[in-house]
Design a protein with these regions (language model features):
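Sec-dependent bacterial lipoprotein signal peptides
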Residues: 1-15
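Bacterial Sec-dependent N-terminal signal peptides
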Residues: 11-37, 188-191
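Short, solvent-exposed coil/turn segments at beta-strand boundaries
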Residues: 33-34, 53-62, 157-167
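Contiguous, well-ordered beta-strand patches that form the walls/edges
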Residues: 40-49, 64-163, 174-190
Length: 191
């Protein structure tokens, strides 16, 4: 009888330890995208250029949009930093054999903007960007997203190649059904 009682107590103890380990593991979300990813220099429609950086830490996804005023990504103009909540969906295998996943990102209520040139400071102050008219060089401010945008969801699909090349597509209303592997703006290399 004592042996049976000891087995029951030991079983209860071990199962409660297992539950604790499982719940702790659930709190720490790690994805295959964990880390920092960066685009090459690409040209915008106004002939300015960008280099974008994505950083994934757990369920937080941060996008840094580095804008340049020239055509060679040499002269910084402004930096925008936008933070999202990130969640993964179903896994996907592409015709190429590469894998990926559907994902959803939720926009926070604010983003950071930093003017990095005198012309950006002047433009920000003239337009009272984000309601401020006291912008200073290389000094970030928190800006509010439009009411309609704050908390909104964006839907995406990514393809991962060899663990260090990421192709991503994002849409506003529904999950995309493909990714463009020839678009510099949506091609990221692991740093």
């Amino acid at each position: 009888m004592k042996k049976i009682l000891m087995i029951i107590i030991l079983s209860l103890f071990l199962s409660s330890c297992g539950e604790k380990e499982e719940s702790e593991a659930e709190e720490e979300t790690t994805t295959e995208l964990e880390g920092t990813w960066k685009t090459a220099c690409y040209t915008n429609s106004d002939n300015s250029t960008n280099i974008d950086t994505l950083k994934f830490v757990g369920n937080v996804y941060t996008r840094k949009d580095q804008r340049y005023s020239d055509t060679a990504c040499a002269t910084v103009y402004k930096l925008e930093e936008i933070t999202y909540t990130y969640s993964e969906g179903s896994a996907v295998t592409f015709m190429s054999g590469n894998t990926g996943r559907y994902f959803k990102i939720t926009l926070g209520s604010t983003y950071k903007t930093t003017p990095q040139s005198a012309s950006a400071v002047n433009a920000f102050n003239s337009s009272s960007k984000c309601g401020f008219s006291n912008w200073e060089l290389n000094t970030a401010k928190d800006c509010d997203h439009d009411e309609d945008d704050a908390g909104s969801n964006l839907y995406g699909l990514y393809q991962l190649v060899d663990g260090d090349k990421l192709y991503a597509s994002i849409a506003e209303d529904s999950y995309p059904n493909s990714v463009n592997t020839n678009d510099t703006e949506s091609t990221f290399t692991k740093q």
